[in-house]
């Protein structure tokens, strides 16, 4: 699910929610057209931090006030945050859930009060969502595992770093990984375990595996870039170089790792683009507009061949990219391809 920002304090506070006016037109009292949309995310990971910037950009251009909360990877905290947003009477709620099988009562409550509640980036197992803006995590897992299988020549030993167990990202990326592994009986999984999307946890997990398996480890498949970067740090500290690592998300450090050769590749899930799309769907629902409520974000593969363009969008020319984000988001909603951003290899419908 992926650089701590100025709102990192929210994550540390867990249950504390912070309303951020992102409309540039004054507060709600000053402008009755302002829409208040509540947001609760699993944690302020690098991915979410980048995504928040995209949502803020879209909100400012569309007279939306965002009320932000981070659940610090705690299901009960997130449930309380959704309850609070419902009680505040926000116009819509966006949830990036901690766990797929959570928030059933909260979703039902929002629906009964006519508040559209959307799951974005990670799924919720409920039929009562007003919107469901999701990445194709199965395809992303298959894509990263195929990269690794190709690099290993279909033979070798790997370890797998998983997201938080029970979250839709972990479940579905794992399904994709397993689909590809089934075609390569000579690739053995030495170990797999969660590092909860976190770089520091992945460092410790990888150190333990290096201690247990040593030179038997031929590759590292990480379900997100942050964990892959943690594995990279542990391998370097152990004096091991050249072990192929693959990740998912295309955060700044992950893209730089692809460019340097420390990663063999990643799958770009540009949080700036994806979360902006989620907000655009929520905004359309609030306004009563026709909109596809379940668009799918298909992540492009990022390798040395196209990483430079991805780095421009995420890092070096980020402000230029943000300046065009609202137009891009609206165009993508029309075409149905919410992941399109002109990366070589992508084709616009």
Curated annotation (Swiss-Prot):
Induction: Up-regulated during growth on D-threitol relative to growth on glycerol.
Functional note: Part of an ABC transporter complex likely involved in xylitol import. Binds xylitol.
PANTHER family reported for this sequence: D-ALLOSE-BINDING PERIPLASMIC PROTEIN-RELATED (PTHR46847:SF1)
CDD domains to which the protein is assigned, alphabetical: PBP1_ABC_ThpA_XypA
Membrane topology: Lipid-anchor
Gene Ontology annotations of biological process type: carbohydrate transport; cellular response to carbohydrate stimulus
Lipidation (S-diacylglycerol cysteine): 23
Principal subcellular localization: membrane
Compartments where found: Cell membrane
Matching Pfam families: Peripla_BP_4
Gene Ontology CC entries for this record: plasma membrane
Domain of life: Bacteria
UniProt xrefs under PROSITE patterns: PROKAR_LIPOPROTEIN
Family as reported in the entry's similarity comment: Belongs to the bacterial solute-binding protein 2 family.
Signal peptide: 1-22
Record-annotated disulphide pairs: none
Keywords: Cell membrane, Lipoprotein, Membrane, Palmitate, Signal, Sugar transport, Transport
Lipidation (N-palmitoyl cysteine): 23
Gene Ontology molecular functions: carbohydrate binding
Chain positions recorded as xylitol binding sites: 42, 121, 173, 224, 249, 269
Protein name: Xylitol-binding protein
């Amino acid at each position: 699910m992926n650089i701590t920002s100025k709102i990192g304090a929210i994550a540390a506070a867990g249950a504390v929610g912070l309303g951020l006016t992102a409309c540039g037109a004054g507060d709600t009292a000053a402008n009755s057209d302002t829409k208040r949309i509540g947001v609760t995310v699993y944690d302020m990971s690098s991915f979410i931090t980048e995504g928040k910037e995209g949502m803020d950009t879209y909100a400012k251009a569309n007279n939306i006030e965002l009320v932000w909360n981070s659940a610090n990877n705690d299901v009960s905290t997130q449930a309380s945050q959704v309850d609070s947003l419902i009680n505040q009477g926000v116009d819509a709620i966006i949830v990036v859930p901690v766990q797929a099988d959570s928030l059933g009562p909260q979703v039902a409550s929002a629906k009964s009060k006519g508040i559209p509640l959307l799951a974005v980036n990670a799924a919720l197992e409920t039929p009562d969502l007003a919107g469901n803006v999701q990445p194709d995590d199965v395809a992303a897992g298959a894509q990263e595992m195929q990269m690794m299988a190709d690099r290993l020549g279909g033979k070798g030993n790997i370890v797998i770093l998983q997201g938080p167990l029970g979250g839709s990202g972990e479940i579905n990326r794992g399904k994709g990984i397993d689909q590809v592994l089934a075609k390569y009986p000579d690739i053995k999984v030495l170990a797999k375990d969660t590092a909860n999307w976190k770089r520091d946890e992945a460092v410790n997990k990888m150190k333990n595996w290096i201690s247990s398996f040593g030179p038997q480890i031929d590759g590292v498949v990480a379900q997100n870039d942050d964990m892959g970067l943690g594995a990279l740090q542990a391998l370097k500290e152990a004096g091991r170089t050249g072990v192929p690592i693959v990740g998912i998300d295309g955060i700044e450090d992950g893209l730089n790792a692809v460019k340097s050769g420390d990663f063999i590749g990643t799958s770009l899930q540009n949080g700036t683009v994806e979360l902006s799309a989620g907000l655009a769907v929520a905004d359309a629902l609030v306004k009563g507009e026709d909109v596809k409520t379940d668009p799918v974000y298909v992540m492009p593969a990022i390798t040395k061949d196209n990483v430079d363009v991805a780095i421009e969008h995420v890092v070096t020319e980020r402000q230029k990219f943000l300046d065009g984000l609202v137009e891009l988001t609206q165009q993508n909603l029309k075409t149905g391809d919410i992941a399109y951003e002109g990366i070589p290899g992508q084709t616009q419908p």
